[in-house]
Amino acid sequence: TYLELAKELHGEQPVIEANPPPARRETIVVIDFGSQYSMLIARCIRECHVYCELISHDVPWEKIASLNPKGFILSGGPFSVYDPGAPLPLPYVYESHLPVLGICYGMQAIVRQLGGEVISGTKHEYGHAILHISGLECPLFAELPSSLPVWMSHG
């Protein structure tokens, strides 16, 4: 929250409840599509003092609802969205009207499901790169610089 951020900036450590009851806990749900980095994504979220759960892409809403989700992160994976039987996010991801962040395959799945086209790049993407962010007005990216070094692993 903004209050916790302000306290951190002024040297006061916010009180973080280690394991609040599920009814009060706000959860980011990381939906795993088979990425080798899914557990790393979840760990990084937790290191930011945000509770998250890593779940398989086929977990039904009935099991998700009890987690009190506040947003979804769709992981990467080894698939192409054009592969027959490629896993896609279940409808609740969109029907919930919660924020969704797609990473790699997760973003491709969003684009495909919402009627967009995913095309192959002209070269393999592996190694250090510079990410240029457009949309800094979005709260998710507001405190980031307009460009930053990243690691890519597509190929």
Protein language model features and the residues they cover:
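Short, intrinsically disordered, charge-balanced linker/junction segments flanking boundaries
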Residues: 153-155
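Two-component His->Asp phosphorelay active-site signatures
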Residues: 34
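Cysteine-nucleophile active-site neighborhood
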Residues: 39, 43-49, 66-143, 147-149
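Flexible inter-domain linker/hinge segments
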Residues: 1-25
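The conserved SAM/SAH-binding core of class I Rossmann-like methyltransferase domains
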Residues: 31, 55, 103
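Short, solvent-exposed beta-strand edge segments and adjacent coil->beta transition regions
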Residues: 25-28, 128
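A short, well-structured beta->alpha microelement
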Residues: 49-65
